[in-house]
Structures are given as C-alpha cells and as structure tokens.
C-alpha cells in the first residue's frame, strides 16, 4: 500500500461513472479491480467494480488456481472522520451483486470489509 496525502471528506459516493477500467485515484489507493459496465446484471450504476479474479486489465490473475487465493481489493484513500461524534450516526453502505453476468461465487470465496485506523491496524467488520 502506498502513502496517500489525499484525505477524503464526507459524503463520499462513487458509482464509477466517471472512470473507465481503473478506480479514480482521487478516491482509491489501489486499482486491483476491473471497473466495467459488462459484468453487472441490471446495474444500479453506469459502471461497477468487479471482484471476480480478473485483474484491473480484465485478465485472470497469474496466480489464480482452483484453491483459494487472494485476488481483488479496493482500498479507499483515508476518510476524515475525526470531527464526527456518535450523534452523527455515520453509515457505510454499498451495493453487492454476487455473480451478475460473471462467474458464480464459490463456497470458498469471501467478501471482507475492513476499517483501518491511523496505526495501520485493521478490524474485520463484515465477512
């Protein structure tokens, strides 16, 4: 992961409509997903970030195998939250569509949402 100087503020929204192929570097630290309009079935947005074992160029990962392996990831730039209080009722939401026009999820596939802290420690919140 690279050091990022761009801190995002709320509200943060990305429907990937302003980019083709790669995530917007102003919002995302990496580009290990394919942004496209062909894989979503009846998409709610113009484009989608595809988590499907295809790299950012649409090619199968070189290390792909029938055994579980680490593949796609999308990491946001830091989001400024230090001015918020519990009364602000902050919510993170995202739209997830398993399979779409692509390969159906395997029993060993997983989708993990992680929140990072300044000290670079992570807490798994959803699996």
Regions found by a protein language model. Give the residues of each.
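Surface-exposed, low-complexity/disordered Ser/Thr/Gly/Pro/Asn-rich loops and linkers
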Residues: 30-91, 98-103
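Extracellular carbohydrate recognition and processing domains
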Residues: 119-127
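Extracellular carbohydrate-recognition regions
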Residues: 1-45
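Conserved aromatic anchor
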Residues: 16, 94-96
């Amino acid at each position: 992961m690279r050091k990022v100087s761009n801190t995002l503020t709320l509200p943060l929204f990305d429907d990937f409509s302003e980019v083709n192929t790669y995530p917007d570097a102003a919002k995302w630290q990496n580009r290990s997903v394919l942004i496209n309009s062909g894989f979503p079935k009846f998409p709610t947005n113009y484009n989608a970030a595809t988590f499907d074992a295809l790299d950012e160029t649409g090619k199968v990962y070189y290390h792909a195998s029938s055994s579980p392996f680490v593949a796609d990831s999308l990491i946001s730039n830091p989001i400024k939250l230090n001015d918020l209080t519990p009364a602000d009722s902050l919510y993170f939401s995202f739209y997830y569509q398993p399979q779409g026009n692509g390969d159906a999820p395997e029993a060993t596939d997983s989708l993990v949402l992680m929140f990072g802290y300044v000290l670079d420690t992570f807490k798994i919140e959803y699996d």
